[in-house]
Swiss-Prot record:
Protein name: DNA replication and repair protein RecF
Gene name as annotated: recF
Main location: cytoplasm
Organism: Shewanella pealeana (strain ATCC 700345 / ANG-SQ1)
Cellular component aspect of the GO annotation: cytoplasm
Stored HAMAP family: RecF
Binding-site residues for ATP, renumbered to this chain: G30, H31, N32, G33, S34, G35, K36, T37
Similarity section: Belongs to the RecF family.
Length: 360
């Protein structure tokens, strides 16, 4: 999957921009505040329906404009398609794929798989299990068509179950919901575990490239005792759930554990090593997607020179090239990226005050 044309309108400080990216690495450079990161953000928004920089979508709409508009032509092998999105300041959103209206944002994610490596993405190892569940679920969503519906049902029933607990309902009332909840919870858990097992096979070699002197162990924890049946646990744990007002254990507590020896990776590794570990995780995820469903991710890499030294920049860029994916990289100075590449970028763009110029 790659973008052959990108149109951005009323997004952050970009009034209007047209890009024709290359299939390989696209270098976007400019001063801080020029709008180069906004291009990455716009691509992400087109694939996810939201920003990776702000939870408030209204903030990305330029000045007093009523809406932002994003459009792209996509290519995957011999197949070509079009995707368009308009987000209004009111919160409404319109999405079209090949001219047909799309109701679910999950269809965007399925159509345009995106991986992000930004200064903020390193929080994967620090912000608690939620971000790591999202990491797992990205892969589970793309690898197994059953996952999304099961995940939606888990969230729906969990919300209902927690409300019953807050209302002080007897277990007989909650048990009615538990039968369905258990079925979906176990399916979500099985798909997650299968995905992490597959990821691990690729990850070992990639971590070895980035951190050859470090033995990192990656494991999946499902959110409750592996030796206990979930149905039994929900029943025996009812008094505790009732006291707390929410379901203490379950797939909503799943996690991806990364350890070095007996220590969590975030305690055993330096900040620089942790950055490399996150890069390895993202690279492995993209490679596994290609392996499982023959679809390439699009990589968005923001402010790479400030995050990695020259040696590791070169290593990351080579690993990205090996995926065969389309890559968008930002930098203040182009030399910081160009000097780390074996071959020149497919395309170079300069951004200044929201205006984008292609560099021939």
């Amino acid at each position: 999957m790659s973008l052959s044309r990108l149109h951005i309108e009323s997004f952050r400080n970009i009034s209007s921009a047209q890009l024709q990216p290359g299939d390989g690495l696209n270098l976007i450079y400019g001063h801080n505040g020029s709008g180069k990161t906004s291009i990455l953000e716009a691509i992400y928004f087109l694939g996810m329906g939201r920003s990776f920089r702000s939870h408030l979508s209204q903030r990305v709409i330029k000045n007093d404009d009523d809406a932002l508009t994003l459009f792209a032509n996509m290519e995957s092998g011999d197949e070509q398609s079009k995707i368009g999105l308009r987000r209004f300041r009111s919160g409404d959103i319109e999405v079209k794929i090949n001219g047909d209206k799309v109701k679910r944002l999950s269809t965007l994610a399925e159509t345009l798989p995106i991986q992000v490596i930004t200064p903020e993405s390193f929080s994967l190892l620090f912000e608690g299990p939620k971000s790591r569940r999202q990491f797992i679920d990205w892969g589970a969503f793309h690898s197994d068509p059953r996952f999304y519906a099961a995940w939606v049902n888990v969230r729906r029933i969990l919300k209902q179950r927690n409300q019953l607990l807050r209302d002080g309902s007897p277990y007989s009332s909650i048990q009615f919901w538990d039968k369905e909840f258990i079925r979906y919870a176990e399916l979500v858990t099985d798909i997650r575990k299968q995905y992490v097992d597959s990821l691990n096979e690729l990850l070992k070699g990639i971590i070895g490239e980035f951190l050859p002197q470090v033995d990192v162990k990656v494991s999946f924890t499902r959110g409750w005792d592996a030796k206990t049946e979930y149905a039994q646990l929900l029943e025996t744990q009812y008094p505790r759930d009732l006291a707390t007002g929410y379901t203490v254990s379950g797939p909503h507590k799943a996690d991806l554990r990364l350890r070095v020896g007996t220590l969590p990776a975030q305690d055993a590794l330096s900040r620089g090593q942790l950055k490399l570990l996150v890069c390895a995780l993202r690279i492995a995820q993209g490679k596994l997607l290609k392996q499982q469903i023959d679809k390439k991710s699009i990589y968005l890499v923001d402010d790479l020179p400030s995050e990695l030294d020259a040696k590791h920049r070169k290593l990351l860029l080579q690993q990205l090239a090996d995926t065969g994916a389309q890559v968008f990289v930002t930098a203040i100075e182009p030399a910081a990226i160009v000097d780390s590449l074996i071959t020149p970028p497919s395309k170079m763009f300069h951004v200044e005050q929201g205006r984008v110029t292609v560099i021939e």
